[in-house]
């Protein structure tokens, strides 16, 4: 049945079958009830309730509200600050222009934010989110569509989600599940949440974070900060002066181009500076350190340096430095006294660096030399920095 309103504010109720409801101009209330219904709100601030069935709705211009209910619904907001609740079912939601608010609900939803600043919570299910242009996701800000204070990022909810920030400075969070989260263009906050996640900051100075699970994170272009939680993670800084932190697990962290700072955290990690003048800090665990090209600093700091032995794989004499920090070491000396460090040759052809902190506790660093180009005689105080 085709049900038509006027250019005033109408209330139109559908039947138990498949209906077509037209609101025209005015602030209309359209409710489909049962059946696979079609809604056309027209101009004005409309409220569209799908009910049971697979419904299709266009809000038109104005600040519209959509309530999907049961069924696989398709809603299009148009111009205005629109509010979407997909309800149960695998829904497709289009925000259009304006600052829109999305709740996907249950089901495998697709959400397209469009232009403007969006709040998106995809809910349960394996969802796909395109945040669109604009600064999407909020942190202690007023949601333009609802007028409420919120701290919600663009969130995937439960399930294995794909989230695309596209343009703008976005806040994106995968939440639970094995998610793919892409920041796109802009200075984005990308949080994978729990699960085994793939994170890509894209262009811009991004902040990437993940919690439990085995994750892969790429900073992309820009000066990025990446921290991965528990799990054996892969981290790539790519272009820019990046800060990479492994935290828990046996991680592999690669700085990429430019001057990076890489911290292994807990676990037996592999750190690669790659191109640029990099700072590598293994922290806890028996770590493998590759400086890469240019002058790099290998840092051994505090109690972490005393707990285990790290291995430097590509130390270049006269180019790279060993920074001994917060151990009370102040000189290169073979005396074995507290506060000293020195090097000796091993029977395997490598170089062992041994030092003693201010209270006489020993620490050691292995300098691997597979090409037999280094010897303890190459080392002197000029290879060390003390702090």
Predicted region positions:
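Short small/polar-residue motifs
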Residues: 10, 283-287, 324-346, 380-382
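Acidic glycine-/aspartate-rich tracts in secreted/extracellular proteins
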Residues: 302-306, 315-332, 358-360, 370-373
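Intrinsically disordered, low-complexity coil segments
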Residues: 138, 143-155, 357, 370-375
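Low-complexity acidic/polar repeat-biased segments
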Residues: 1, 339-387
